[in-house]
Amino acid sequence: MVSNASALGRNGVHDFILVRATAIVLTLYIIYMVGFFATSGELTYEVWIGFFASAFTKVFTLLALFSILIHAWIGMWQVLTDYVKPLALRLMLQLVIVVALVVYVIYGFVVVWGV
């Protein structure tokens, strides 16, 4: 078995399970947000702040952000591995994507817990 240091999971089955699990988390988060928008009536700044003042909403939002990170990394790794053959270019693109995803999650963490 070939081990790849840039893959997130231990093997293809592990990646498959991670992608499915993160998809479920993201689907539940979308349902949660749609439910909020459908039941909140008029959406004002105070309502929005009140919604994100809840610890459950903050934790669920961060879980969704981490799920996006994992889901996107596995998907982009698979696409780059399949279609970008020059090693240097593939590693550079992987680095750029990882940095962008990590910055995205850190920024999301700051925004969510800054409310």
Curated annotation (Swiss-Prot):
NCBIfam families: PRK09488.1 (NF007022), succ_dehyd_anc (TIGR02968). Gene3D superfamilies: Fumarate reductase/succinate dehydrogenase, transmembrane subunit. This is Succinate dehydrogenase hydrophobic membrane anchor subunit. It is a multi-pass membrane protein. Heme binds at residue 71. The chain crosses the membrane at residues 16-36, 59-80, 91-115. A ubiquinone binds at residue 83. Pathway: Carbohydrate metabolism; tricarboxylic acid cycle. GO terms for cellular component: membrane; plasma membrane. It comes from Escherichia coli (strain K12). Its main location: membrane. CDD domains: SQR_TypeC_SdhD (cd03494).
